[in-house]
Amino acid sequence: MSIEETLLRFEKKYMFLYEIEVNGFPVYTCFRDRVNLLLSGDEAEKKVEYENEKGRIYPKRIWDSLLKYRKLKKSKTLIFTSSMFRRDYGRNLAAEYLMEKYPDAVVFEWPSRTDAYDVAYFQDSKKDRYCPIDCYILVYKIYSRLHRKEEIILEEKCRKRLVDYFENENGVEDGVEKQIINMLIQEMPKSYASTVISQQLFRKLFRKYNNIEYAIDFWGSGRENIIPVLPGEFESIELQHGIITEFHPGYIYPTKANEKCKRFFARTLLLYGEATKKLLIQKSVFTEEQIEVIGNPRILKYKQEFGESSEKRQYILFTSQPFEQDVKGAEYYSEMIPILQSVQKQLNTDEKWKKYSLAIKLHPRENNGIKNKYEENIPECKVFDNATQLYELLGKSFLHITATSTTLYEAALFDTPTVLVPYQGYKSEDIFGFNVKKINNKLPDELVESEKYEDYLKYLKNQTMNYM
């Protein structure tokens, strides 16, 4: 039985988990990744040790936040996102696309605590249409302390409800299931209570926003904490972030999960491709009427604004991403680094590959501690930090290597073929929807031949069009 089937089987057995909601938001959905982790066989979440690095707090962002909450109250379209998506020369191209698509749109932006992204707000030509949410973080700390007793009461009521639900169920099958139940009883009430407090505060912050026609979440905590408490009647929308594959805990839900929290599941989805639309209709609880296919707005706007690199393709580019797709990332670096060391050796010694150099692009959530780890273990490679322009690098790369990163799809659109390194037994068909070439410790020599290279690239581009 696949991980997906195991999770859905667990959820169908305990469907009451979807009934514990805060203004229509099912709190359990925040725990699907963690439940999946336990079901997959890892009894405890493991953390990779690396340098803890935090970006600055910008008082000016907090001040602007306080001022703009009042200034923007007549806006018709509210977009919730994060400065983490300022990945293209300091701009959030997907948010810009949404601002053009919907009337009188403004963007509410969480800080990422990544300096290169947070500071980009100050240089943005569209700054007047952005409102940092930084002040919420400050106000929440004060508000939650003042309402600590209420939070404790909410937590205990939720815990009692969970205990009662589970006690009425018979046939807990094994130790893993018991472990999951204990975890949910311990942790889910905390999330429930903090969500109630968070929604209370957002209700106060947005209480005078009476002209809302559209509320859009683009990885901005909108669907959980903000959209459920906005005033008036409006359309709730979510822009797809990342590639949705056969199993994605943020989109693939069991049948009948939407019977209780109807408003949460009734949101409109803006998707990248027809294959994703088909997947959500057939495998999840969404209907065709809820879905609009728009392509990948970030890539569309990037090519429109910046074009594509005309420089020589010099890199063999590895995209690092232990946080993405993968719930079992504890051994990621110890497995990836030896493979990359072998690739570096091949580039140094094999005449066919000597004109290329190994480069590593960090995931946006990997910091300088990881940069140092790669540089220490593979000193001849070039490591690009988490703020480097991904699409620019793809345009300069002859080949893209990854374990499970969905950058594969983006690479194909920038004419860069992808090969996979093995990791945790994942199959490319399960992750990407089609077969992808794999390597162990050596790059495939056939791709040096231009005809085979072009044929493989054409294959990847054709497959990618289903998803992008």
Q: What residue ranges belong to the model's regions?
A:
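Catalytic-core helical/loop segments in enzymes performing group transfer/polymerization on anionic/lipid-linked
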Residues: 1-468
